[in-house]
A protein has these predicted regions:
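Short, glycine-biased loop/turn motifs at secondary-structure junctions and
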Residues: 1-161
Length: 161
């Protein structure tokens, strides 16, 4: 994903890296590349990561796309149905500049079904939402806390075997 991630990884074995990583965005990136055939699991996990910022979402379309992601992950709706929710969430982001990061995170969660880069972006956007919630009082701490939270979500929801 970036030089920082590669430097952190160093010579760590995959199991060690997965167990100790504190960046959900890096974990989603790795999982999407290693387990590209597990799309529903990935989208479900991305939705859980983005849901860490759901309390900041003020447009119902953004909340709806998170629910749709969970339905997709459970096999209840098709990829095409999920993408229709993603489009609605994108429209929410476009229409409301003040909630752009929150709506964009929800949109990217749904878009992860077709674009692996969206999974990483969604977790980063959730961390950015946490940053804005902290009103920049402790920007780095809020971001770090959210990335650690999403890393724990990844370990809980994504089987790496």
């Amino acid at each position: 994903p970036c030089v920082e991630a590669v430097e952190w990884l160093g010579d760590k074995a995959f199991d060690e890296a997965w167990a100790t990583c504190e960046r959900g965005d890096w974990m989603l990136w790795a999982y999407a590349r290693l387990y590209y055939d597990r799309n529903r699991e990935l989208v479900g996990c991305v939705a859980e990561c983005v849901a860490t910022a759901q309390h900041l979402m003020t447009d119902q379309r953004s909340v709806d796309v998170l629910k749709a992601c969970k339905k997709y992950a459970n096999g209840e709706i098709s990829k095409e149905e999920l993408l229709s929710y993603a489009i609605a969430s994108y429209e929410a982001a476009e229409a409301n500049a003040d909630i752009n990061a929150h709506a964009a995170a929800a949109y990217q969660a749904a878009h992860a079904a077709v674009n692996v880069h969206s999974a990483t972006y969604a977790a980063s956007a959730a961390a950015a939402c946490a940053d804005s919630a902290a009103a920049y009082a402790d920007f780095a701490a809020a971001r770090k806390k959210n990335l650690k939270l999403t890393a724990d979500i990844c370990r809980r929801l994504l089987p790496c075997s």
